[in-house]
């Protein structure tokens, strides 16, 4: 527990952070403790599995909790709530207006946005090379200034391997605030697009969802937000064939009158041949730059049929060596993508027109 001096009730119901419960054979206890000691992990024997069909907890030799297995299986009293998914504002949720009169002013304003600017100072506080498994550093290129959108790590194994895990996340708080349904759907798409842009196939991805919402009240509108988000994510799971195998939720995102935006953040992971992974930085002057466009449906939802075709096309082109750099267009639009792809090797880009540099953030574009 986080605090000392807790009474028996507090100990029984307290939440333990950064802990892991492991069930082992009694005969393996000493061997297991030895392994933990080798990894400098504190381990404590806290319970035994019995055939009494009761969960009993003791504190200082005194029985303080005694619950039947049948009661635990019932999950307690049933709760019911009404949910109402509210209508959304009639507008283009992807359109952004960037301040500035000239192209230079707009580019600088876009790159200075809190959701676009570099987080290198924060990232450098963490060691990305631990375990000698890192395939892509957080920033790539000769100058190490092109932002990487995925985490790629070779699998820990004895001997040599080219198999790596590749993971990315997706979430846009502005889109989710406009519509939790759309926000969750595009969170799934965003993570898949980043993985594809780095050289992996999307169709074997598995997800974990991190959900964080305001405190639930008696208002059906508050319950409608997590319901809408889960429906949006489920729709993408079904249409893209990408299941979520875990997750975590919290409904305590309220402080006085301040609520967190509706959040369903999608973390997607799959495997990839490390030799096929590509970075975001431009490699050579004279290379052509293409936008593989995703056009949302009239209701602003992802066109999953088009996305699957685009993802397959890009993956095949990367595997054949035709694509050497990739970036999933995000909050800052194509303008952000071109700038960040340029920084790594100091190689610029000539855009055909300002239209192609707009800072709209249509998700799923590569």
Where are these regions (language model features)?
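Glycine/proline-enriched, intrinsically flexible loops and inter-domain linkers
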Residues: 1-358, 363
